[in-house]
Design a protein with these regions (language model features):
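N-terminal Sec-pathway targeting helices
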Residues: 1-17
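Hydrophobic alpha-helical membrane-insertion segments, chiefly the h-region
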Residues: 17-25
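Active-site-adjacent pocket scaffolds in enzyme catalytic domains
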Residues: 18-19, 31-32, 153-154, 163-219
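Active-site beta->alpha N-cap acidic-glycine motif
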Residues: 27-108
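An acidic- and aromatic-residue-enriched active-site/binding cleft used to recognize and process polar
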Residues: 46-48, 89-91, 122, 161-164, ...
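Alpha-helical scaffolding within the catalytic cores
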Residues: 67-72, 96-109, 144, 194-218
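Structured segments of extracytoplasmic/periplasmic soluble domains
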Residues: 75-80, 145-149, 177
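Metal-dependent polysaccharide deacetylase catalytic core of the NodB/CE4 family, i.e.
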Residues: 83-167
Length: 219
């Protein structure tokens, strides 16, 4: 009986010790809440077109932020200071970005400090050969369209391309138009853009990698 009590007491002691260790781990792992007025959460979305298509097609909207998706972004910005980059298709389904009107241009410009737009791909269907051959034309179409309906200040300085694909010719085009920052793959073992396996692994390990004047950042 006495031996049994000792075993139970030992087990309880071990459990208490494990709880204490776990509590200390949680305490040191979770960041201390900040009262700073300069807190920023940066969030980015790929494959964007439905919210922009809705703005184009729904005539009753008198503000960007009547559209449900943009309304949600505005609420997150107002409450948490979140800033957003939306990476858009040139075309998808019945959407063509060159058809977007400039109805909300001034409002986009007024909110461009926290809401940006950038190129993502020609369309959802991914074809490496087409994406490479048509890249400059498609990139400029999207860029000019964003300038038309959202203004220069709404252009995202950092891009994330479809499937993290960009060969050397596409990278050269990006540099031609002063784009020097790319968001890379966030999963281990995946190739990002024109980086080789070793370089992509370094990007994953270090969270950032500079190669040939391009600054690659882990998504």
């Amino acid at each position: 009986m006495r031996v049994g009590k000792k075993i139970i007491f030992s087990l309880i002691s071990i459990i208490v010790a494990l709880i204490a260790i776990f509590s200390v781990y949680i305490y040191v792992s979770v960041p201390i809440p900040s009262n700073s007025q300069n807190k920023i959460v940066q969030i980015s979305f790929d494959d964007v077109y439905l919210c922009i298509k809705d703005l184009k097609d729904t005539l009753r909207y008198t503000s960007v932020f009547q559209q449900p998706f943009f309304k949600s972004l505005k609420e997150l910005h107002d409450v948490y200071g979140a800033v957003f980059s939306l990476y858009v298709y040139e075309k998808a389904d019945n959407f063509v970005i060159t058809e977007v009107p400039d109805k909300f241009r001034n409002e986009f410009i007024e909110n461009s400090e926290w809401l940006k737009f950038g190129y993502h791909a020609i369309e959802p269907r991914f074809d490496k050969k087409e994406q490479s051959l048509e890249f400059e034309r498609s990139f400029l179409n999207v860029r000019k369209s964003i300038l038309h309906w959202a203004g220069k200040s709404s252009l995202a300085p950092c891009l994330r391309l479809h499937y993290y694909f960009a060969d050397d010719s596409m990278i050269a085009i990006l540099k031609k138009y002063k784009v020097y920052h790319l968001l890379g793959a966030d999963d281990e073992g995946r190739i990002s853009y024109n980086l080789n396996r070793l370089q992509s692994d370094s990007l994953y390990a270090r969270r950032a990698y500079i190669y040939d004047s391009i600054y690659y950042i882990l998504s």
